[in-house]
């Protein structure tokens, strides 16, 4: 086992990364090894997808499978070895299908078959012990390479993994694009070649950022086409009396299915974590039994799910061990999510969830409502832009902070609470991702009717923040980096990595990230990123605010 993809990975003077019998996330070594092997075979699938495209062979089924299966290896998604082996076997079938199609076209056209990469050629074993024996070939730190080369490879690998997750979220909303899929395959195939070309690897990281910008636009279009444009909305965040289902993750299509299937059954539905923004979409407001948001960010789920007196559905990341809170018999997984022994739902029938919710007590009384305001995504931000611009011009608004990203359980993440609460009263704070839970239930007031705290939405809704920044730069006839805008991003896993690459690829500079740098980035690479982009780690709130606000 070697895994270094998330913030909680082991860090020691001897080296970084989880490499023992179990990772810090709870992932067993065998599970980690199977994930590595899956990625390796997927790189082989992509290698043949690239070659097949030379003959205009585009297999839409494979184009959607590869990012979906890749998503299953993201932090806190799938811990189920049996399911991972199914993905490996399916990937191998698809690899053979593309190989046969490509070689047939070569023969028909009198073209030599190309020499393929190792992931394209590996003869896959058929049983778990033999698959695990092959896993070292696929380890992310395979080979004897300089640590900077390895760091760049992993930056690309984890960034592309984040993009794959967003591609799958978009696909669920019927948003696919053959050109985007082709670019994805090209990068995936390249990473399977184990390049040692520093310039090419760095350029690829920027290509991943550009690719993800397109994917986020697709996802934005898919969500707004399906559910309307989010609008400022007050949301209750405490218990409501009655039977209950909690929906976590990111998949709003699953949420809609659950709402439709629970109509008239006396069950209240709550969102959790990154599903909170769903409550701002007009299409969901027609369901009176969607009563609010329960709980906070992913790392608190073992306590929050244990206390929730109903059924829980995990539609995507993040899942952690449900046995700790003794609720494994009432949590259900969907799509790419998996945990051994937990019921996995295939298809669109949520009867098992409904029956479980009806059999449980539910909340026995209403709590006094506690309301927060959400829904400041792209359309709402654009509608507010004229008022924001006017308040900048008259001096009422002097600075913008984007404070968001992934949450986590490290104590020093209190930094993000503190920088939001200590930001000057003449500043606006935009937030997104589950990092918002560090402060989204606090009161920030307003500036001439404009709320100081603007909740943009899920982590992928950084697309909305980018659109606002572009609009402001056009209004003030300046570059984005000349705006009084500071980005302070909390990172935990691979979606945050690809959002960062997206921003860097768009030329956004002077971003602060924290609380700790990714363990796979060497000191040399961090220095290069700071020199090239002004990217730096957070320090103290006082020092960072002084620098941001140019206080001597």
From Swiss-Prot:
GO terms for biological process: response to hydrogen peroxide. Pfam families: Prismane. Hybrid [4Fe-2O-2S] cluster binds at residues 250, 274, 318, 406, 434, 459, 493, 495. One of its GO terms (molecular function) is metal ion binding. GO terms for cellular component: cytoplasm. Its EC number is 1.7.99.1. Its main location: cytoplasm. It is found in: Cytoplasm. [2Fe-2S] cluster binds at residues 3, 6, 18, 25. Its cofactor is [2Fe-2S] cluster; hybrid [4Fe-2O-2S] cluster. It is an enzyme of class 1 (oxidoreductase). It catalyses: A + NH4(+) + H2O = hydroxylamine + AH2 + H(+). The modification Cysteine persulfide is found at residue 406. The keyword DNA damage does not apply. InterPro entries: HCP/CODH (IPR004137), Hydroxylam_reduct (IPR010048), Prismane-like_a/b-sand (IPR016099), Prismane-like_sf (IPR011254), Prismane_a-bundle (IPR016100). Belongs to the HCP family. Catalyzes the reduction of hydroxylamine to form NH(3) and H(2)O. This is Hydroxylamine reductase. It comes from Shewanella woodyi (strain ATCC 51908 / MS32). The gene is hcp.
């Amino acid at each position: 086992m070697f895994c270094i993809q998330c913030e909680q990975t082991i860090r020691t003077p001897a080296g970084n990364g989880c490499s023992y019998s179990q990772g810090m996330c709870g992932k067993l070594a065998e599970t980690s090894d199977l994930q590595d092997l899956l990625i390796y075979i997927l790189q082989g699938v992509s290698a043949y997808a690239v070659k097949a495209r030379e003959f205009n062979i585009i297999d839409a089924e494979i184009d959607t499978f590869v990012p979906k299966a890749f998503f299953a290896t993201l932090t806190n998604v799938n811990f189920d070895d049996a399911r991972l082996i199914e993905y490996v076997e399916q990937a191998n079938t698809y690899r053979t299908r593309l190989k046969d199609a490509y070689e047939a076209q070569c023969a028909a056209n009198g073209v030599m078959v190309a020499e393929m990469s190792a992931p394209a050629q590996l003869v896959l074993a058929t049983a778990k012990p033999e698959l695990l024996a092959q896993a070292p070939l696929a380890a992310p730190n395979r080979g004897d390479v300089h640590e900077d080369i390895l760091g760049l490879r992993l930056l690309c690998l984890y960034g592309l993994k984040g993009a794959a997750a967003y591609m799958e979220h978009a696909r669920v909303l019927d948003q696919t694009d053959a050109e985007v899929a082709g670019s994805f395959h090209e990068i995936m195939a390249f990473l399977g070649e184990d390049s040692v070309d520093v310039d090419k690897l760095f350029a690829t990281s920027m290509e991943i950022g550009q690719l993800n910008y397109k994917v986020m636009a697709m996802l934005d279009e898919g969500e707004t086409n399906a559910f309307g444009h989010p609008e400022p909305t007050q949301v209750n965040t405490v218990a409501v009396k009655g039977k209950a289902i909690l929906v976590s993750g990111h998949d709003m299509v699953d949420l809609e299915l659950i709402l439709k299937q629970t109509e008239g059954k006396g069950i209240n539905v709550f969102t959790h974590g990154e599903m909170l923004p769903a409550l701002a979409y007009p299409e969901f407001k027609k369901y009176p039994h969607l009563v609010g948001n329960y709980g906070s960010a992913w790392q608190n789920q073992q306590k929050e799910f244990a206390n929730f007196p109903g059924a829980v559905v995990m539609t995507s990341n993040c899942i952690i061990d449900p046995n700790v809170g003794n609720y494994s018999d009432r949590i259900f997984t969907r799509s790419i999510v998996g945990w051994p022994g937990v019921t996995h739902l295939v298809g669109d029938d949520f009867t098992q969830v409904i029956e479980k919710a009806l059999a449980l007590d539910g909340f026995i009384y209403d709590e006094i409502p506690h309301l927060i305001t959400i829904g400041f995504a792209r359309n709402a931000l654009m509608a507010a832009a004229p008022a924001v611009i006017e308040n900048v011009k008259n001096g009422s608004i002097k600075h913008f902070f984007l404070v968001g990203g992934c949450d986590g359980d490290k104590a020093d993440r209190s930094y993000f609470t503190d920088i939001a609460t200590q930001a000057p009263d003449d500043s606006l704070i935009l937030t997104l991702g589950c990092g918002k839970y560090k402060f989204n239930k606090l009161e920030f007031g307003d500036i001439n009717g404009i709320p100081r705290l603007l909740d943009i939405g899920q982590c992928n809704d950084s697309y909305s923040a980018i659109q606002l920044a572009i609009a402001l730069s056009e209004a003030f006839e300046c570059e984005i980096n000349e705006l009084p805008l500071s980005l302070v991003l909390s990172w935990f896993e691979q979606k945050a990595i690809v959002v960062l690459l997206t921003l860097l690829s768009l030329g956004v500079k002077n971003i602060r990230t924290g609380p700790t740098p990714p363990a796979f980035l060497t000191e040399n690479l961090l220095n290069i990123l700071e020199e090239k982009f002004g990217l730096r780690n957070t320090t103290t709130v006082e020092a960072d605010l002084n620098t941001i606000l140019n206080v001597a």
